[in-house]
Amino acid sequence: MDEITLKALAKINLGLDVVRRREDGYHEVRMIMQTIHLYDLLEIQKIREPEIQIVSNLSFLPVNENNLVYKAARLLQEEFALTDGISVKLTKRIPVAAGMAGGSTDAAAMLYAMNQLYDLGLSRSELMKRGVQIGADVPYCLMRGTALAEGIGEKLTQLPPMIKCPVLIAKPSISVSTRFVYQNLKLDEQTNHPDIDALMKDIREKDFDGVCAHMGNVLESVTIPNYPVIAEIKQQMMRSGAKASMMSGSGPTVFGLFEDGETAKRALREMKRSGLAKQVYLTTIYNNRRK
Protein backbone atom coordinates (compact mmCIF):
# COMPACT_ATOMS: atom_id res chain seq x y z
CA MET A 1 0.00 0.00 0.00
CA ASP A 2 1.41 3.37 -1.06
CA GLU A 3 -1.50 5.72 -0.40
CA ILE A 4 -4.57 6.03 1.78
CA THR A 5 -7.41 8.53 2.24
CA LEU A 6 -9.01 9.00 5.65
CA LYS A 7 -11.73 11.07 7.27
CA ALA A 8 -10.68 12.75 10.53
CA LEU A 9 -13.84 13.31 12.56
CA ALA A 10 -14.57 16.18 14.96
CA LYS A 11 -15.70 15.83 18.56
CA ILE A 12 -18.02 17.72 20.87
CA ASN A 13 -18.20 17.58 24.66
CA LEU A 14 -21.61 16.57 26.00
CA GLY A 15 -20.29 17.38 29.46
CA LEU A 16 -17.12 19.08 30.71
CA ASP A 17 -16.16 19.48 34.35
CA VAL A 18 -12.83 20.61 35.80
CA VAL A 19 -11.96 18.71 38.97
CA ARG A 20 -8.81 20.46 40.16
CA ARG A 21 -5.74 22.39 39.14
CA ARG A 22 -2.55 20.37 39.47
CA GLU A 23 0.77 21.70 40.76
CA ASP A 24 2.23 21.47 37.24
CA GLY A 25 -0.42 23.91 35.99
CA TYR A 26 -2.53 21.35 34.15
CA HIS A 27 -6.18 20.88 35.05
CA GLU A 28 -7.77 17.51 35.74
CA VAL A 29 -11.10 17.08 33.99
CA ARG A 30 -14.08 14.77 33.65
CA MET A 31 -15.59 15.02 30.19
CA ILE A 32 -18.02 13.13 28.01
CA MET A 33 -16.56 13.11 24.51
CA GLN A 34 -18.66 12.41 21.43
CA THR A 35 -17.66 12.03 17.78
CA ILE A 36 -19.78 13.81 15.17
CA HIS A 37 -19.93 13.35 11.40
CA LEU A 38 -18.07 16.55 10.53
CA TYR A 39 -14.62 15.77 9.22
CA ASP A 40 -11.36 16.82 7.62
CA LEU A 41 -10.01 14.76 4.73
CA LEU A 42 -6.42 13.51 4.62
CA GLU A 43 -4.98 12.10 1.38
CA ILE A 44 -1.68 10.51 2.34
CA GLN A 45 0.96 8.83 0.21
CA LYS A 46 4.54 7.65 0.43
CA ILE A 47 7.15 9.65 -1.49
CA ARG A 48 10.82 9.01 -2.24
CA GLU A 49 12.09 12.29 -0.81
CA PRO A 50 12.84 11.77 2.91
CA GLU A 51 10.63 14.60 4.13
CA ILE A 52 7.12 15.40 5.33
CA GLN A 53 5.15 17.49 2.83
CA ILE A 54 1.79 18.98 3.84
CA VAL A 55 -0.50 21.09 1.70
CA SER A 56 -3.81 22.47 2.94
CA ASN A 57 -6.84 24.31 1.60
CA LEU A 58 -6.32 26.91 4.37
CA SER A 59 -3.47 29.31 3.63
CA PHE A 60 -3.05 30.34 7.28
CA LEU A 61 -2.60 26.79 8.56
CA PRO A 62 1.02 25.90 9.45
CA VAL A 63 2.36 23.01 7.37
CA ASN A 64 5.63 22.56 9.27
CA GLU A 65 6.55 21.08 12.66
CA ASN A 66 3.90 23.29 14.28
CA ASN A 67 1.20 21.17 12.65
CA LEU A 68 0.09 18.12 14.66
CA VAL A 69 -0.07 16.03 11.48
CA TYR A 70 3.62 16.74 10.94
CA LYS A 71 4.38 15.82 14.57
CA ALA A 72 2.49 12.53 14.23
CA ALA A 73 4.35 11.59 11.06
CA ARG A 74 7.72 12.53 12.56
CA LEU A 75 7.01 10.52 15.72
CA LEU A 76 6.55 7.26 13.83
CA GLN A 77 9.27 8.02 11.27
CA GLU A 78 11.83 8.38 14.04
CA GLU A 79 10.62 5.45 16.16
CA PHE A 80 10.58 2.97 13.27
CA ALA A 81 13.45 4.48 11.23
CA LEU A 82 11.22 4.93 8.19
CA THR A 83 13.22 6.16 5.20
CA ASP A 84 10.33 7.07 2.89
CA GLY A 85 8.85 10.52 3.01
CA ILE A 86 5.17 11.32 3.39
CA SER A 87 2.95 13.65 1.37
CA VAL A 88 -0.32 14.86 2.90
CA LYS A 89 -3.13 16.78 1.25
CA LEU A 90 -5.21 18.12 4.14
CA THR A 91 -8.69 19.44 3.36
CA LYS A 92 -10.00 21.23 6.45
CA ARG A 93 -13.73 21.43 7.17
CA ILE A 94 -13.65 21.29 10.97
CA PRO A 95 -13.41 24.86 12.31
CA VAL A 96 -9.86 25.71 13.46
CA ALA A 97 -9.17 26.55 17.13
CA ALA A 98 -12.80 25.86 17.90
CA GLY A 99 -12.92 23.36 20.79
CA MET A 100 -13.63 20.46 18.42
CA ALA A 101 -10.21 18.71 18.41
CA GLY A 102 -9.60 19.51 14.73
CA GLY A 103 -5.81 19.33 15.02
CA SER A 104 -5.90 16.29 17.31
CA THR A 105 -8.19 14.28 15.03
CA ASP A 106 -5.93 15.04 12.04
CA ALA A 107 -2.94 13.78 14.05
CA ALA A 108 -4.87 10.66 15.04
CA ALA A 109 -5.72 9.98 11.40
CA MET A 110 -2.04 10.40 10.50
CA LEU A 111 -0.95 7.85 13.11
CA TYR A 112 -3.59 5.40 11.90
CA ALA A 113 -2.62 5.94 8.25
CA MET A 114 1.09 5.38 8.81
CA ASN A 115 0.36 2.22 10.78
CA GLN A 116 -1.52 0.96 7.71
CA LEU A 117 0.89 2.25 5.05
CA TYR A 118 3.97 0.77 6.68
CA ASP A 119 2.29 -2.30 8.17
CA LEU A 120 3.69 -1.41 11.60
CA GLY A 121 1.33 -3.79 13.38
CA LEU A 122 0.46 -1.39 16.20
CA SER A 123 -2.80 -2.02 18.05
CA ARG A 124 -5.24 0.80 18.74
CA SER A 125 -4.06 0.98 22.36
CA GLU A 126 -0.42 1.16 21.21
CA LEU A 127 -1.29 4.00 18.85
CA MET A 128 -3.12 5.77 21.67
CA LYS A 129 -0.02 5.60 23.90
CA ARG A 130 1.93 7.36 21.18
CA GLY A 131 -0.89 9.80 20.52
CA VAL A 132 -0.78 11.28 24.01
CA GLN A 133 2.77 12.47 23.26
CA ILE A 134 1.25 14.74 20.59
CA GLY A 135 -1.80 16.01 22.46
CA ALA A 136 -4.24 15.04 25.22
CA ASP A 137 -7.18 14.66 22.78
CA VAL A 138 -5.33 12.47 20.27
CA PRO A 139 -5.96 9.14 22.09
CA TYR A 140 -9.70 9.84 22.13
CA CYS A 141 -9.65 10.74 18.44
CA LEU A 142 -8.08 7.35 17.76
CA MET A 143 -10.83 5.66 19.80
CA ARG A 144 -13.87 7.70 18.65
CA GLY A 145 -17.48 7.14 19.68
CA THR A 146 -18.76 8.04 23.15
CA ALA A 147 -16.25 8.10 26.01
CA LEU A 148 -15.51 9.41 29.49
CA ALA A 149 -12.20 11.29 29.55
CA GLU A 150 -10.39 11.90 32.84
CA GLY A 151 -6.97 13.08 34.00
CA ILE A 152 -5.92 15.77 31.52
CA GLY A 153 -8.17 14.04 29.00
CA GLU A 154 -5.98 11.05 28.26
CA LYS A 155 -7.61 8.49 30.60
CA LEU A 156 -10.46 7.06 28.55
CA THR A 157 -13.40 4.79 29.28
CA GLN A 158 -15.53 3.74 26.32
CA LEU A 159 -19.26 4.26 26.90
CA PRO A 160 -22.29 2.82 25.08
CA PRO A 161 -23.11 4.80 21.93
CA MET A 162 -25.00 8.05 22.30
CA ILE A 163 -28.48 8.26 20.77
CA LYS A 164 -28.09 9.37 17.16
CA CYS A 165 -29.56 12.82 16.54
CA PRO A 166 -29.00 15.94 14.40
CA VAL A 167 -26.29 18.31 15.65
CA LEU A 168 -26.06 21.97 14.64
CA ILE A 169 -22.58 23.50 14.84
CA ALA A 170 -21.97 27.27 14.95
CA LYS A 171 -18.59 28.99 15.35
CA PRO A 172 -18.54 32.77 15.77
CA SER A 173 -15.77 34.86 14.20
CA ILE A 174 -13.83 35.21 17.45
CA SER A 175 -10.77 33.46 18.84
CA VAL A 176 -10.71 32.09 22.36
CA SER A 177 -7.42 31.16 24.02
CA THR A 178 -7.65 27.84 25.85
CA ARG A 179 -4.92 29.03 28.20
CA PHE A 180 -6.90 32.20 29.01
CA VAL A 181 -10.03 30.17 29.77
CA TYR A 182 -8.31 27.77 32.16
CA GLN A 183 -6.23 30.50 33.82
CA ASN A 184 -9.38 32.49 34.57
CA LEU A 185 -11.46 29.57 35.79
CA LYS A 186 -12.11 30.13 39.51
CA LEU A 187 -12.71 26.61 40.77
CA ASP A 188 -13.12 27.69 44.40
CA GLU A 189 -16.03 29.94 43.37
CA GLN A 190 -17.58 27.44 40.97
CA THR A 191 -20.94 26.10 42.17
CA ASN A 192 -22.48 24.96 38.89
CA HIS A 193 -20.64 21.73 38.09
CA PRO A 194 -22.24 19.43 35.50
CA ASP A 195 -23.32 16.02 36.81
CA ILE A 196 -21.11 13.79 34.69
CA ASP A 197 -22.29 10.60 36.43
CA ALA A 198 -25.94 11.43 35.69
CA LEU A 199 -25.00 12.14 32.09
CA MET A 200 -23.31 8.74 31.76
CA LYS A 201 -26.42 7.08 33.21
CA ASP A 202 -28.60 8.89 30.66
CA ILE A 203 -26.35 7.72 27.82
CA ARG A 204 -26.43 4.11 29.03
CA GLU A 205 -30.24 4.22 29.32
CA LYS A 206 -30.70 5.94 25.91
CA ASP A 207 -32.50 8.79 27.69
CA PHE A 208 -32.27 11.68 25.23
CA ASP A 209 -34.21 14.11 27.44
CA GLY A 210 -31.95 13.21 30.36
CA VAL A 211 -28.81 13.84 28.29
CA CYS A 212 -30.15 17.24 27.28
CA ALA A 213 -31.06 18.09 30.89
CA HIS A 214 -27.66 17.11 32.31
CA MET A 215 -25.38 18.60 29.63
CA GLY A 216 -23.05 21.27 30.98
CA ASN A 217 -19.67 22.91 30.49
CA VAL A 218 -17.99 24.56 33.47
CA LEU A 219 -15.77 26.62 31.13
CA GLU A 220 -18.77 28.68 30.02
CA SER A 221 -18.44 30.52 33.35
CA VAL A 222 -15.31 32.13 31.85
CA THR A 223 -16.16 32.41 28.16
CA ILE A 224 -19.70 33.79 28.26
CA PRO A 225 -18.90 36.88 30.39
CA ASN A 226 -15.95 37.62 28.10
CA TYR A 227 -17.58 36.62 24.80
CA PRO A 228 -21.35 37.25 25.04
CA VAL A 229 -21.89 36.05 21.46
CA ILE A 230 -21.52 32.48 22.77
CA ALA A 231 -24.63 32.95 24.92
CA GLU A 232 -26.42 34.62 22.01
CA ILE A 233 -25.76 31.61 19.77
CA LYS A 234 -27.00 29.23 22.47
CA GLN A 235 -30.18 31.28 22.85
CA GLN A 236 -30.70 31.38 19.08
CA MET A 237 -30.42 27.58 18.89
CA MET A 238 -32.92 27.10 21.71
CA ARG A 239 -35.37 29.51 20.07
CA SER A 240 -35.01 27.47 16.88
CA GLY A 241 -36.02 24.25 18.60
CA ALA A 242 -32.83 22.71 20.00
CA LYS A 243 -33.43 20.39 22.96
CA ALA A 244 -30.09 21.53 24.42
CA SER A 245 -27.25 23.85 23.43
CA MET A 246 -23.75 24.15 24.85
CA MET A 247 -20.23 25.35 24.10
CA SER A 248 -17.82 22.60 23.06
CA GLY A 249 -14.47 22.38 24.85
CA SER A 250 -12.98 25.79 25.60
CA GLY A 251 -14.95 27.29 22.72
CA PRO A 252 -15.93 29.29 20.94
CA THR A 253 -17.97 26.73 18.98
CA VAL A 254 -21.52 26.12 20.16
CA PHE A 255 -23.59 23.06 19.28
CA GLY A 256 -27.25 22.18 19.61
CA LEU A 257 -28.94 18.77 19.77
CA PHE A 258 -32.23 18.28 17.95
CA GLU A 259 -34.89 15.57 18.00
CA ASP A 260 -35.70 15.70 14.29
CA GLY A 261 -34.07 16.68 11.04
CA GLU A 262 -36.68 19.17 9.85
CA THR A 263 -36.37 21.30 12.99
CA ALA A 264 -32.58 21.12 12.69
CA LYS A 265 -32.67 22.24 9.04
CA ARG A 266 -34.88 25.20 9.94
CA ALA A 267 -32.50 26.08 12.79
CA LEU A 268 -29.58 25.95 10.33
CA ARG A 269 -31.28 28.49 8.07
CA GLU A 270 -32.19 30.73 11.00
CA MET A 271 -28.65 30.61 12.40
CA LYS A 272 -27.20 31.62 9.04
CA ARG A 273 -29.67 34.51 8.77
CA SER A 274 -28.84 35.70 12.30
CA GLY A 275 -25.23 36.52 11.37
CA LEU A 276 -24.05 35.37 14.81
CA ALA A 277 -21.72 32.68 13.49
CA LYS A 278 -19.19 32.68 10.68
CA GLN A 279 -19.20 28.89 10.21
CA VAL A 280 -22.43 26.90 10.50
CA TYR A 281 -22.83 23.17 9.82
CA LEU A 282 -25.59 20.61 10.27
CA THR A 283 -24.31 17.14 11.01
CA THR A 284 -25.14 14.18 13.23
CA ILE A 285 -23.86 12.04 16.10
CA TYR A 286 -21.32 9.47 14.85
CA ASN A 287 -20.91 6.25 16.82
CA ASN A 288 -18.63 4.00 14.74
CA ARG A 289 -15.57 3.22 16.82
CA ARG A 290 -12.16 2.79 15.26
CA LYS A 291 -10.91 -0.78 15.70
Model regions: which residues?
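ATP-binding N-lobe of GHMP and related small-molecule kinases
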Residues: M1-A98, Q116, L120-M128, I134, ...
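ATP-dependent small-molecule kinase catalytic core of the GHMP/sugar-kinase superfamily
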Residues: D2-K7, G15-D17, R21-M31, L120-A244, ...
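Residues embedded in well-ordered beta-strands within globular domains across many folds
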Residues: E43, S87-K89, M246, Y281-T284
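Short, basic/glycine-rich phosphate-binding loops at helix/coil junctions
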Residues: R48-P62, M110, E205-M215
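A generic structural signal for short
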Residues: L61, G99, S221-V222, G256
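Glycine/serine-rich anion-binding loops at beta->alpha junctions
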Residues: K89-Y118, A136, K243-F258
